[in-house]
Amino acid sequence: MGRAIGIDLGTTNSCVAIMQGKDTKVIENKEGARTTPSIVALTSSGERLIGAPAKRQATTNASNTFFATKRLIGRQYSDPEMKNLSVPYKVFAAKSGDAWVKTTDNKEYSPSQIGAFILQNMKEAAEAYLGEEVKDAVITVPAYFNDSQRQATKDAGKIAGLNVLRIVNEPTAAALAYGLDKKHGHTIVVYDLGGGTFDVSILEIGDGVFEVKATNGDTHLGGEDFDNGVVSYLLDEFKKSNGIDLKNDPMAMQRIKEAAEKAKIELSSAMETEINLPFITADASGPKHLNMKLTRAKLESLVNDLIERTMAPCKKALEDAGLSASQIGEVVLVGGMTRMPKVIEKVKEFFGKDPHRGVNPDEVVAIGAAIQAGIIQGDVRDVLLLDVTPLSLGIETLGGVFTPLIERNTTIPTKKSQVFSTAEDNQTAVTIKVHQGERKLAVDNKLLGQFSLEGIPPAPRGRPQIEVTFDIDANGIAHVSAKDKATGKEQKIRIQSSGGLSDNEINRMVKEAEEKAQEDEKRKKFIEVKNQADSLVHSTEKSLTEYGDKVSPEDRSAIENAVNELKEVSKSDNIDDADSIQQKVTNLSQLSMKLGEAMYQTSQQNSAENGFSSEGNPNDKEEKVVDSDYQDIDNKEENK
């Protein structure tokens, strides 16, 4: 079995780690950073940029730069959370009803594909570090992700060419990283406020056992919402001052969003920051600049309601675990937003103790995922992880009532069966609608999918016995079966949401990813040969200036023509022209050898004029050494 990696696929940033012996290692990306922005950009030339390079060009390519797509993964376009989505790129309803994204040239991508591009980048970073192919991975998701979102994340891993060993809840992974060396039993809370989601989990840790007692959260609450609060404030203030609404200017909006995020981060350590965006727009009177100061107090007033929203899940998790805040031994902070002083203050106020600050909130989840990979592969022993399902799972019964079969916070993997019957006389088929949530009516909960059990013998209502079995695996993904106990007929399905990616779509995306990898390799070769061409043209032109009069007119003309031909072919942006450029490079390299000979002869003449002739002075030891060196070089040149 090859090495397995742990990946934190975040809304804002992603991170990859690996076990090395008993230690964990966070792997740096190509830019040398330990985290990678979860941003994918498609350029006009067809190039795909991931991470920091994608972020750098976002201002000028906002409509084709996809960020925070984790908020879309596994979601239907009609979901209520989609209404308040504020992004510069196009989000639309795919045929399945899922929320997908679209470029300006109408190329369509599922959020799982965008996630796969980021996972691929993590995979490549790990392979570059290890020097070997990586196939296996543990990927983390927010604890409050539903079945559709978990399945969509697993699909992203498959598209990226990874065998997903396990889907692990982010707070649980963080607890693993925090508590692996803790021997004495105690209860902890993991408060995870990231870029797009909020989770809180309560765990008991002791003697290598990590048992999740309860989990709660909000899959649409995170740093993006804090940024949007600042953006709205800046837009309103600018409109008051200048009478111009910038909401419909994508480039201005992107600049403001970046400035808002930067200001938010700075105010975690400073009391005041200045936002200065020159030439943000223009009107008849000339260019307009956005320049204003933002204090920490003002930021806190803008986002206070968001911080307050994290308290309700904390209360619910404590209730579900049957604990009070005073019974919590440690509060572990995870996610970049937990660096905000007001968040730390609120957590301290709620739990009555200073939060533990000994883990890196940006890296701890990936480290925990790497530990889980080590557990699965047998590299980490004597550790048992008992996670829970975050939401109740059940079916729709008579009258549209939601009947849970597996209650929330049930330890997984788990399996449960219940017998139901028909609602009408002589009913020969039943449709099983599977829902996930906590509301009393099925329609108010998330419909995960449905299937039919047919061929039931006609009988009075209530007599047939239909056994419905729910099986939730360690990934938190459900498998459901229905069986007619009289006939033994059974229908099994792995829950696939009413939307979701079909196997054919996943296979197509896997193939596209493989083809794109080949194209990326061609593009890399193309860039390398263009750089080689530019360098050769520069050095040849420099040599022509200095030594052009030392070669024959015919040779000089041939070299100049070759330089012009290489310049012309190098203007191409078509990656298929790499071989043509390489041929011109080879041709110019061969012709410019004449210049090399001229350079050598000039150097030889200069040496002779300075007294270092081949005759030398037999009575001068230093000249004998020079004479010997000169003869060696001369002989080598003759042998060429």
From Swiss-Prot:
Signal peptide: none annotated. The modification Phosphothreonine is found at T197. Keywords: ATP-binding, Chaperone, Nucleotide-binding, Phosphoprotein, Stress response. Residues 539-556, 618-640 have a biased composition (Basic and acidic residues). Residues 537-556, 596-640 are annotated as: Disordered. InterPro entries: ATPase_NBD, Chaperone_DnaK, Heat_shock_70_CS, HSP70_C_sf, HSP70_peptide-bd_sf, Hsp_70_fam. Transmembrane segments: none annotated. GO terms for molecular function: ATP binding; ATP-dependent protein folding chaperone; unfolded protein binding. Induction: By stress conditions e.g. heat shock. Coiled coil: none annotated. Residues 600-617 have a biased composition (Polar residues). Belongs to the heat shock protein 70 family. HAMAP family: DnaK (MF_00332). NCBIfam families: PRK00290.1, PRK05183.1, prok_dnaK. Acts as a chaperone. This is Chaperone protein DnaK. It comes from Wolbachia pipientis wMel.
